[in-house]
Amino acid sequence: MNTNDFDFELPEELIAQTPLEKRDSSKLLIIDHRQKTMVDSHFDHIIDQLNPGDALVMNNTRVLPARLYGEKPDTHGHVELLLLKNTQGDQWEVLAKPAKRLKVGSQVNFGDGRLKATIIDELEHGGRIVEFSYDGIFLEVLESLGEMPLPPYIHEKLEDAERYQTVYAKENGSAAAPTAGLHFTTDLLKKIEAKGVHLVYLTLHVGLGTFRPVSVDNLDEHDMHSEFYSLSEEAAQTLRDVKQAGGRVVAVGTTSIRTLETIGGKFQGDIQADSGWTNIFIKPGYQFKVVDAFSTNFHLPKSTLVMLVSAFAGRDFVLEAYRHAVDEKYRFFSFGDAMFVN
């Protein structure tokens, strides 16, 4: 299959720049790929798509305020670092701008020197490995100095940083939010649980690769980014019990899907506690092993995420649903509306 097979027309005004006032007031397009049906709804009605005994699986990663602005003490030149992943101890892989000024041994100061970074290795495409030095607790220093790394297609300033976190965000480590979860409120989750649905949490730390365009025509040549995931024994046991009792595993977002399917692939369809790195690329032809249904936002044309949804529901039907969403003025991408896929 070709990358262009997943292209569609998207007017720029449909790219949501700000979150809605109420998280669960977004629109929800409910699609059933077997019946070939589409129903326009609202997100708080997602509870009607869930049955007692189902498991709703959510990614509890928390977005780090990973964008840092500093200066080189020798030249006072301005530098921007974007934290990508913690490699070990106080060492991080970062994206640096302007990278050409930052050679091994270069120093950058942030916040009057409260946080210092030393370049210890150079990677391609502006990547660097840095070692941080600071007083106190790193995450607290980062919270006070860093900014939320919003996606490149969002140009408005975010008034409340918590709106780019899910209400259940807990495990620090992402460079981007698992946006399908942004629609849930604490109240809605309580109602879902009261219906007899099991709430299950896993962790996948979302990397910036999630925004990286597919640069090859032939999908088989695409090099998928790696992300760290973790599923606890308690969560795995709940999911096994749900499957055994005939319930469905309903994933919230593509990050939950990728975690569950990575584990399903590793353990021949069984669900086991596990952690590690995944670069799973789910595209048409893939056989799903764990996930029975899911919610997700509307994704970028030609992205690996549109390909994932197409693997589950069929490319032609998914693109038809996307055309419907465009016609009905659904809001797209991170702060946009959602789709529920049966």
Swiss-Prot record:
Record's GO cellular component terms: cytoplasm
Molecular function GO labels: S-adenosylmethionine:tRNA ribosyltransferase-isomerase activity
SUPFAM superfamilies referenced in this protein's UniProt entry, alphabetically: QueA-like
Keywords: Cytoplasm, Queuosine biosynthesis, S-adenosyl-L-methionine, Transferase
Predominant subcellular localization, coarse grouping: cytoplasm
Subcellular location: Cytoplasm
Catalytic activity from the UniProt record: 7-aminomethyl-7-carbaguanosine(34) in tRNA + S-adenosyl-L-methionine = epoxyqueuosine(34) in tRNA + adenine + L-methionine + 2 H(+)
Domain of life where this protein originates: Bacteria
Keyword match Signal: no
Keyword ATP-binding: no
Pathway info: tRNA modification; tRNA-queuosine biosynthesis
Pfam families the UniProt entry points to: Queuosine_synth (PF02547)
EC number, as in UniProt: 2.4.99.17
Subunit field text: Monomer.
Function of the molecule: Transfers and isomerizes the ribose moiety from AdoMet to the 7-aminomethyl group of 7-deazaguanine (preQ1-tRNA) to give epoxyqueuosine (oQ-tRNA).
Protein name: S-adenosylmethionine:tRNA ribosyltransferase-isomerase
Protein's organism: Streptococcus pyogenes serotype M5 (strain Manfredo)
Gene behind this protein: queA
